[in-house]
Amino acid sequence: EELRKLSNFKISLILNKQNYGIGGSFKILFNYLKSKDFSYWINLQSSGRYDASQVLSNLFEIQSTKTDIDYYLHSRFLKPEDSKKYNFIRKIANHFFIRLTKICTNCNFSDPGMSVFMISKKLSTVLLNKEFTQLTNDSHFPHFMNVVLYKYLKEYKEININWKEGNVKSHLNSLSYPVLLLINLINFKFKGSFIKYNKKNEFDYEKLDFDKIA
């Protein structure tokens, strides 16, 4: 029903000229949205891991009664039954890194690696700050973004999401991903920031390499 309502809206597609990774694509989106007029924007990415229409319905229902909340973050781990169909090893690894994230960064999200969220226009302006644009362009970006964003939050709400294995094989490397996450969290603990791997992570927003099709 919610998706049918959205069908009447104008849809813009941003087609990147190359693969910038999830972090790079987020940064391009942040810059694109800065001149747009809206109250909130929603990020959905799934590969069949959850019911997107149910997520939208929940967000619209909750937001209609709460106007002072800047950030709504979905969590796989608020209720045990929400991750029953999720890979057991990945679930254990997630719980380990969630606890480690709290210890190293003081970020108290129950699922800091989650990238299904709704954010207000007011709060999203901070996403153009250097501490976000200098984050990695790779798959760790949502986790790092949530950690850095946490300190800006006055009011936020976590919403449970029913999560399962998707219909597309995970692209995450089971060895390098946790190792790099561990190194970055330790770096944050002692230096107060994540590792800046190289200059290419920070986009020149005046020279973005993408085609926008409305």
Q: Where are the model-predicted features located?
A:
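Acceptor/aglycone-binding surface of glycosyltransferases and processive sugar-polymer synthases
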Residues: 16-35, 40, 52-135, 139, ...
